[in-house]
Amino acid sequence: MPMTFTTCISAQDFGLASETMIPGFQASQLSCAAPAQVVPVDPCHVFDESFLQDLVLWWTWPDTRIPLYIAGPTGCGKTTSVLQFLARVHVPVISLTCSRRFVKDDLVGRWGAHEGGFAWIDGPATIAWKTGAVLLINEFSLAPPEV
């Protein structure tokens, strides 16, 4: 489902001395259900301008089904920068980390015991799809190929 932006956020809110406006949402507009959360803005976070331009390009791309793959050394700020970008455009995020034992059910959901029977329990990808949250997957390359 395509996103419909409702406001524009100044690039100055991202620490840039630019007059560029970045589409986003009003803070009070989006609600989120667990495990999604709107990350608080860290006013001390400094964006790499080139990285931020790539995020904005992805964010404003017309086809919302296109995933964004970010690579870089451990600790260089990939996850933090994405979370801080989403905080500033007021979008809930569901974050998870893959491992070699990660299975498709960990992502999509599974049937589980519930009140004497069975019920479908949504996984993070399903919750993100239903709620409009961004799904942030760390260490995706560690997941088995079938995931």
Predicted regions and their residues:
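AAA+ P-loop NTPase catalytic core and its hallmark functional loops
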Residues: 2-147
